[in-house]
């Protein structure tokens, strides 16, 4: 869009095509700083370029500061009201967007519009529950900070259910999700936690469950009801489930740890008994309830420091959702290909909204945050405030490091516990005869240099990443 200057200004000049330009002369001001104001609101999808021929300089205006501070409380995802199904998506620099949806074998496309230039909304008559849908997002890729591609289907980041990691999203309204029953987890200082992978614990479980059920939430629910289930006998009062939010998987039956999330609102379709009908929501809720009936609290291992493939958020806005270097390339302190920009207001909102849903709709008792150093202290503190308002006895645990740094000491004055890698390394040395009693006393006494109280340190010898007595 060409910004037409006021024609009566003394420094207006016209180019060969008759376009009006404002000539800014260093000879007039003696300064190398110019302040340029214009009326109205410029969309972030617009391009504004400044040219200084005398200096041989030209370039686009950088809106990064404005971009990275955009926030909207508007509803996102699919919702039903007043006889219409509406779809809303945050894409602040998109030039156009549409929703492709299919119901009862009939495919349609609905164009979206944006009132504020950030939230795009498309509506269709009727209740579209069960419809499959994708977004199409388009815009001009002026530099490496965007990755728009209208040919690439984009699953809804706020979809409550996915048919598979590759999509499509499934229309499932919040009103149709389960509602959790109250459960009081053990106090932090009484926690005995076992980390488990759903398919690992079911692979050799002695229970009357089929091979297919051994891959699902439902299979673990059935095993928990069996009197021979060792999870009920081993002495733990809490399990930490490795990731169960929708994650990258080539095939539904593939064994994956789950640390490459593609959607934080949909329980994993790979673990559903009937993903075609989005059973994962009810399947997962029943599993949490089964653990609670057995007196066992449920912590989820959650990954908010990076995303997997397909990377849908990079199509919505690469710079808004991801940390970039000066060349516009994705940063990679996670070691997983990208670092999620959690301090962007709508990115942080997405984290909080998904955590709240896991507590309110599924009854989850706590969270272990993968590579929490990348999530950032400010976001972690906001998570603590919001989660403890929602559930005062929520369990919050950080893996307090990344390839960038370590924040265990910085978490000392928060309500987070931290995985203690110092204890892990010391116990290996101790077992090999290289440790001493003073060191043992320090770690068993709560590692008070980084912890305010003993229960704030999570001492462990083995995890999915660390078999330190063998490594």
Residue ranges and their predicted role:
Residues 1-43, 101-104:
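Immunoglobulin-like IPT/TIG beta-sandwich domains and homologous Ig-like subdomains
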Residues 26-84, 107-109, 114-195, 201-212, ...:
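The feature marks proteins involved in alpha-glucan
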Residues 90-96:
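Short proline/glycine-enriched turn/loop motifs at strand-loop junctions of beta-rich domains
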Residues 97-99, 133:
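Short beta-strand elements bearing conserved aromatic residues within extracellular beta-rich modules
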Residues 159-170, 384-471:
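Conserved alpha/beta catalytic core and glycan-binding cleft of carbohydrate-active enzymes
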Residues 184-188, 197-362, 372, 379-387, ...:
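Substrate-binding/active-site clefts of carbohydrate-active enzymes
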